[in-house]
Amino acid sequence: MPCYHKLKAWQLCSGEVVFAERGAIARELELPCGQCIGCRLKRSLSWTIRNVHESQVHPLSMFVTLTYGDDGYNPSLVYRDFQLFMKRLRRSVGPCRFFAVGEYGESDELNRYVRTFSGLDTTSRRPHFHALIYGQYFSDRAQIGSVDGKPLWRSPRLEALWKHGHSSFGDVTFQSAAYCSRYCCDKVNGERALDHYKRVDVATGELVDVVPEMAHMSLRPAIGVPWLARYGADIVCARDGVVLNGKTYALPRFYDRVVESLVPDLHSDKEFDRYILSEKFAADLTPERMAAREIVAKARISTLQRKL
């Protein structure tokens, strides 16, 4: 996905990048804004690819959903609750890696889900966590339903570990990884965030601030690095991209940085090849075409329903 609102910048002879013309300028740059729908979708896709690759190096993995019940209900996400859940999980089943996001239910999709499988009466944008857990799986599972044809399970062991409400789990797939990664598209920044992250506390009637959507993950090593160490050199040399679900995607930017640090000459060659290839698509990068593509991207993302 391209950036639809690139920022003009300048690189000084010292190597510093500035956003106002000053000093000894070496060259002019166009940098991604990081906030438009194109940048958010690109970041989301990168996390999806890295999480799918992470799952491929573990024999066991699961997609866990943790919601809050009505007892002691807090309208805001509390990351400490998830941290303690992970500590209990590791004490119970052993080492594991994870990629977790905390977010708030969109429209009534989460509310319908919670009412269906837990019986809770929900009327607000309920905070919840999704986590891709690598290296462990609950064998005491019992099916409680399905989402998009994929079975959804409950587990007494999982319920004992998450003490704040309803819990369930399914399999890690491209779709579930993408579902987690789309938190990038939900987070609101800037002036809009002041009103967006306010909720009414149903217990007191007060207007309270809630924390924004968040993501936390295993860092040592980073998500996707075990896969990259095993297959990365062959993939980069062969096609400069990755294939998932029969479709070829560009390498995540993080993979590029790792390859650059390990094999700088190979990275330089690939960068030059990409520059030459980009010349073929120059006609599709005019301001008019970019404006049209942004409209299409926003329309496409609006059709993606969140069902968990």
Across the structure, where does each feature detected by a protein language model lie?
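Long non-globular sequence segments
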Residues: 1-18, 246-308
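Conserved His + Asp/Glu catalytic blocks
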Residues: 105-111, 122-127, 133-272
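Signature for HUH/AEP ssDNA processing cores
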Residues: 42-123
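DNA replication initiation on ssDNA origins
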Residues: 1-52, 274
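Short, charged, low-hydrophobicity "junction" segments
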Residues: 36-39, 43, 68-71, 153-160
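Sequence-level motif detector for i,i+2 pairs with an aromatic at +2
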Residues: 31-34, 58-63, 95-96, 164, ...
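Residues in well-ordered beta-strands of folded domains
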Residues: 37, 65, 99-102, 168-170, ...
